[in-house]
Amino acid sequence: MGAVMGTFSSLQTKQRRPSKDIAWWYYQYQRDKIEDELEMTMVCHRPEGLEQLEAQTNFTKRELQVLYRGFKNECPSGVVNEETFKQIYAQFFPHGDASTYAHYLFNAFDTTQTGSVKFEDFVTALSILLRGTVHEKLRWTFNLYDINKDGYINKEEMMDIVKAIYDMMGKYTYPVLKEDTPRQHVDVFFQKMDKNKDGIVTLDEFLESCQEDDNIMRSLQLFQNVM
C-alpha cells in the first residue's frame, strides 16, 4: 500500500479541486449551502432513527440534518443508484475515466449489496473516512480493495484497483506513468503485505503492515483525496 499510495502523493493532476479532500469538501459545501436555511426551518424529511445515526457515527444531529438535506438535494428519491453515483463522482476527475473506480467505491458504500446507497450507508462511510480511527479507516480501505468480498486481497484485485485509480487520474499526471507502472506497484505491495507468501493479503496482514510503515500511514490522507 505504501508503494501504491505513496506514488499517488507525487502525482499532480489538473483537477477542478486538486488539493481538496472530496469527502470533506462535500460536507463543507452542503453545510455552507444550507446552514442559513436551517436557522429558519427544520428539515422536513429525515431518515428514521436520526438519533440512532448520531449514536452510530461521529456526526452531531445538526450535521446529520445538513448532510441529509444535501443528500436529498442530489438524490430526491432518498437513494442513489450506481449510474447516478458514477455521474456525480466523475465531476471530480474531468481529465480521467473515473467509472471503474466509482464502481468499486459504490460497492464499498453499498454494504447490503442492494444496488443502491441509502443515506444511512452514505453517512456511515463518510463518518469513518472523515472522523474514524486509523484502524477503522484501514478496515474500510481493505473492504474497498477486496473486490469480491471473500475476506482477502489477491493480486488481480489489487491490479484492478491500481489501474482504476490511474485511469481516474487521467493523462494529466506528472511524472508521466509508464505502462508497466501499475504491475510494479502491485508487486511491491505484495512483497510488503503478504507476510506468509501465500499469494493473498488477509485483513490482519493488511492492518499489521500498514501500521508498521510510517509512509503508509502518511499516505492514508491520499486515499481520502480520491474518496
UniProtKB/Swiss-Prot annotation:
Q: Name one GO biological process term.
A: potassium ion export across plasma membrane
Q: Interaction with KCND2: where is this region?
A: 214-227
Q: Which GO terms describe its molecular function?
A: calcium ion binding; potassium channel activity; potassium channel regulator activity
Q: What does the UniProt entry say about where the protein is found?
A: Cell membrane; Cytoplasm; Cell projection, Dendrite
Q: Name one GO cellular component term.
A: voltage-gated potassium channel complex
Which residues participate in Ca(2+) 2 binding? 194, 196, 198, 205
Q: Which UniProt keywords apply?
A: Calcium, Cell membrane, Cell projection, Cytoplasm, Ion channel, Ion transport, Membrane, Metal-binding, Potassium, Potassium channel, Potassium transport, Repeat, Transport, Voltage-gated channel
* Tissue-level expression: Expressed in brain. Found in a subpopulation of neurons widely distributed and enriched in Purkinje cells of the cerebellum and in the reticular thalamic and medial habenular nuclei.
Residue sites binding Ca(2+) 1 per the record: 146, 148, 150, 152, 157
- Give all residue intervals belonging to the EF-hand domain: 38-94, 97-132, 133-168, 181-216
Q: Which domain of life is it from?
A: Eukaryota
Topology in the lipid bilayer is annotated as:
Peripheral membrane protein
List where this protein forms a coiled coil.
Answer: none
Which Pfam families has this protein been placed in?
Answer: EF-hand_7, EF-hand_8
Family, per the entry?
Belongs to the recoverin family.
Its quaternary organisation is: Component of heteromultimeric potassium channels. Identified in potassium channel complexes containing KCND1, KCND2, KCND3, KCNIP1, KCNIP2, KCNIP3, KCNIP4, DPP6 and DPP10. Part of a heterooctamer composed of the tetrameric channel and four KCNIP1 chains. Probably part of a complex consisting of KCNIP1, KCNIP2 isoform 3 and KCND2. Self-associates to form homodimers and homotetramers. Interacts with KCNIP2 isoform 3 in a calcium-dependent manner.
Job description of the protein: Regulatory subunit of Kv4/D (Shal)-type voltage-gated rapidly inactivating A-type potassium channels. Regulates channel density, inactivation kinetics and rate of recovery from inactivation in a calcium-dependent and isoform-specific manner. Modulates KCND2/Kv4.2 currents. In vitro, modulates KCND1/Kv4.1 currents. Increases the presence of KCND2 at the cell surface.
Identification of the protein by name:
A-type potassium channel modulatory protein KCNIP1
Species in which this protein is naturally found: Mus musculus (Mouse)
